[in-house]
């Protein structure tokens, strides 16, 4: 469960850092201006990398302080972060960026002693360090640039990376390697915090500081997973786990080289551009790419023990089918009909009548507004014990909530919102881990509250939230992660407590989000509940006999 603490802290740090960076962006020159090649039409700050990188690294350094590989990874990540900030502010040349990438990768390969020693199709062959290290540097730089170049639409690169990281975290769980799990979940947390600001239309872009760090993290995790942590798995798994970005960058480079163009000149021939040209909306394009990426990473998990030949053949079959379909559609002039491609289903008449009833319309929101605070308090009051470290953190957060309330901050402010998420996660963790003497009853009551909250959220989001709350591609990622956890748990490979905790946390996060979008007062019930929950947890954790 420590991994999910790492993820929760990463989410909170990311969500708190990005608004600060957003205010500094114009002064630092970190603003992405629109041009004919880009999809956005207004200036957008390029500071998402602050939340992704710092939000991911801080929890990892706290949990794995003495690990040599993590030290090298953290140092390399900070180097890429520094070079990325430079590029986000000044638009440096590709050669300067390569210098930063080589420095970061070199640290991991030589100081962290991480390199490829076994390759697909040659199980008995062990590469010497003289060959394995240069090959690893080349491969990691390639992955960094593949993710960097896939960052073309709101939530695209971050979402693709998250899908890969979810699969890597699960494979790390199967291998029993805490570092793989921690690194993957921390980066998922930092990315989730960023996605809060990057769903279409984006308020923040990740910039090079974020995209290079994501590529670096994915590359390091894949090498470590297949070369050290999980050597019984196929050595070809990185193909499926990286998925679409690696094929996309190779296809784009081929088109540039065959067309006599500059290798590094940005063009509009990535997969997402081609889908947009075929009439797909932004939402449809991102969800389509997410779906392909999800299929590939699920394939990696299911085929982890299959032969390298089968894994590689599956990858190339999926990729070849995708590019063949795109090419045929483009040559035939096919366009998606927007009238027939709407993803919104018509509502049944009976449901519409219920949704139009003023009294019934207010009921789901009332349930959400009551159950979320009640669950928070239930978590602090009903559990058997609260660890002292929880008590210390809760006390600090209680002081932060009180300060924010006295300063006039509503639940919708970014700092308050992040604190609410952490409080909800604390309550969920405590109920799952320390249910108390009446454990079965406590769990059933918590399950009932989460079920009622999920039902109210489903009704509210689907039928009653035309203006204030809408589903986004990020919801696809959340649904994918939740379904994956449930399916893996049902197959006997997952941990029941982990699935329960994540389910609780996700439903509570959506509840906090719905309430926060509609709260104007600092004295709202949710704020008071968070303050009371954290205060009780602090007192019970620091003074168990009180």
What is each residue range found by the language model?
Residues 273, 277-338:
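C-terminal membrane module of polytopic membrane proteins
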Residues 20-24, 324-340, 517-523, 543-545:
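Membrane-interface capping segments at transmembrane-helix boundaries
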